[in-house]
């Protein structure tokens, strides 16, 4: 990561721009990340918000956003961003908007849209080299409708649609790699529990032209089944166990920005969440736990 104005925690914004009193769940990891990201982006943003948890932020006639906000269907937020960006570019070209009035075009979606329903429109937007920032809060399920399985659901997790003794039999898609395969301007994974790493990446992305993704793991007390006050700790465990690598893609290169000095066992992360309780009770499922650990170890063996 290039030199950043955020060198220590003292450099982080002291106050949040995003308003309070929203209808979000207590301890929402997505809202935690959004607060931090919005502080860096500033008020001159237009949020194109796909259907999902975060649409509860702007319940008419109230909104916590200080800039523009547009609601779209789950699959069409990048198309909405194209319209917003095109409209502003036309106004700029005709002199009806000054460069000082120009605004950042930001798509805001959950993993249901980012990994699944909206992936085709996202791919098209990247191929058109649309100048937009895509922000995904990844709570690893369709959280707004009861935590059904999504393309981001991890192996063996219990969801509303996979309640068996082994949980979800499939595997989480690698959205970071899918975006990187398009050769966009920038891709970064972040988490609200690591605010300095997050701030540096968002600040960098803000000053890059083209399609950019900020992919934020969003620990979800409601869907993952843990207490709201544990959100930050769960987030740190995701990083320390190696389950959620913090990295960035730029100019064809991938760089890890925070490598755990000594990774903790993955089960230390899993056992704190009710969605994985079936791996430990009433009988420990050593084979599934080892399978999950082996996949994490295999990932890091390529970089260590």
Question: What are the residue ranges of the model-derived segments?
Answer:
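Electropositive phosphate-/nucleotide-binding environments in soluble metabolic enzymes
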Residues: 15, 27-31, 74, 78, ...
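Glycine/aspartate-rich loop-and-adjacent alpha/beta segment that forms the canonical ThDP
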Residues: 198-304
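Conserved thiamine diphosphate
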Residues: 9-12, 101, 150-208
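Cofactor-binding active-site loop characterized by glycine-rich and histidine/acidic residues
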Residues: 3-134, 147, 152-155, 165, ...
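Structural signal for hydrophobic packing residues in well-ordered secondary-structure cores
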Residues: 38-45, 85-91, 170, 180-183, ...
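Short, conserved beta-strand edge motifs with alternating hydrophobic and charged residues
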Residues: 136, 188-190, 213-217
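Short gly/pro/ser/thr-enriched loop/turn and capping motifs at secondary-structure boundaries
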Residues: 54-55, 139-144, 221-223
């Amino acid at each position: 990561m290039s030199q950043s104005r955020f060198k220590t925690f003292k450099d982080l914004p002291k106050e949040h721009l995003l308003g309070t009193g929203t209808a979000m769940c207590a301890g929402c990891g997505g809202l935690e990340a959004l607060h931090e990201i919005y502080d860096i982006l500033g008020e001159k943003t237009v949020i194109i918000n796909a259907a999902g948890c975060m649409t509860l932020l702007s319940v008419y006639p109230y909104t916590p956003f200080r800039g523009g906000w547009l609601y779209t269907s789950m699959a069409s937020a990048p198309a909405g961003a194209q319209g917003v960006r095109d409209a502003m570019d036309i106004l700029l070209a005709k002199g009806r908007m000054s460069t000082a009035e120009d605004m950042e075009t930001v798509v805001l979606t959950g993993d249901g849209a980012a990994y699944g329903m909206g992936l085709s429109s996202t791919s098209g937007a990247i191929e058109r080299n649309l100048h937009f920032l895509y922000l995904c809060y990844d709570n690893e399920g369709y959280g707004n409708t009861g935590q059904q399985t999504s393309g981001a659901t991890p192996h063996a997790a219990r969801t509303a649609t996979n309640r068996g003794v082994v949980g979800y039999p499939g595997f989480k898609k690698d959205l970071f790699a899918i975006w990187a395969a398009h050769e966009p301007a920038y891709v970064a994974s972040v988490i609200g529990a690591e605010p300095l790493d997050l701030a540096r990446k968002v600040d960098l992305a803000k000053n890059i032209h083209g399609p950019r993704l900020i992919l934020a793991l969003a620990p979800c007390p409601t869907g993952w089944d843990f207490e709201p006050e544990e959100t930050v700790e769960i987030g740190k465990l995701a990083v320390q166990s190696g389950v959620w690598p913090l990295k960035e893609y730029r100019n064809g290169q991938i760089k890890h920005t925070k490598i755990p000095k000594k990774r903790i066992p993955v089960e230390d992360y899993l056992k704190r969440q009710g969605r994985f309780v079936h791996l430990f009770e009433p009988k420990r499922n050593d084979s599934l736990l080892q399978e999950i650990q082996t996949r994490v170890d295999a990932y890091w063996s390529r970089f260590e």
